[in-house]
UniProtKB/Swiss-Prot annotation:
GO cellular-component term (any): photosystem I
Location, primary (coarse class): plastid
Protein family according to the UniProt entry: Belongs to the PsaJ family.
InterPro entries xref list: PSI_PsaJ, PSI_PsaJ_sf
Record function comment: May help in the organization of the PsaE and PsaF subunits.
Key words of the record: Chloroplast, Membrane, Photosynthesis, Photosystem I, Plastid, Thylakoid, Transmembrane, Transmembrane helix
Localization terms from the record: Plastid, Chloroplast thylakoid membrane
Coiled-coil region: none
Annotated protein name in UniProt: Photosystem I reaction center subunit IX
Topology of this chain in the membrane: Single-pass membrane protein
A GO BP entry: photosynthesis
Length: 41
């Protein structure tokens, strides 16, 4: 189990998790606000 937690804390795994989270966040923002450039303030 110690080796598995060491593997999960390596840079490629952390980067992949962070990129997946960021991509999902951007997709959901674009789903609820489809074209933010069209907003007129």
């Amino acid at each position: 189990m110690k080796d598995f937690t060491t593997y999960l804390s390596t840079a490629p795994v952390v980067a992949a998790a962070w990129f997946t989270f960021t991509a999902g966040l951007l997709i959901e923002i674009n789903r609820f606000f489809p074209d933010p450039l069209a907003f007129s303030f």
